[in-house]
């Protein structure tokens, strides 16, 4: 059969594949493969234990708590050691306000960055332990650079590199400690709140104690 001009045969036409359909098929295949991999690697009974948790906490929320308190306590200890947090007459109100401003920024940014790290880590629970440790340390380093840099920027801008350099080892060590412990206690990506809170305060307290120790810094 030919068109009215007789130029080509309509019967020879073949339908072009729908690009959106191909995208959806590709996405579906990836999701199926991810679900199969997750099913193979989950510990027996993890899903049942997660459903039975009285107060489950998702991974991003647990890491957000860690980031929040890491942005609160370790910087406060540093400010006390350097400036007495502005509580002495020698430093006065301006130093106190600067320390408080930097602490507030670290607190807020630390929480946001902690949630970001948690979302990234959430996809790595079924990966090998060395990969989880390396990823958590690298993401902790990123947390420290961003949180410390923005917090230090309050100190007239030039405190940003100092803050980033000070917070980078804090984030690296804290998240490298927290991630494997969280993995041991979590079930299907969920951890009970009664386990998460002591874990957060334990890691944060350890970091703060190391900073406060004259034998370490």
Task: Identify what each model region corresponds to.
Residues 2-217:
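Juxtamembrane/disordered regions of integral membrane proteins
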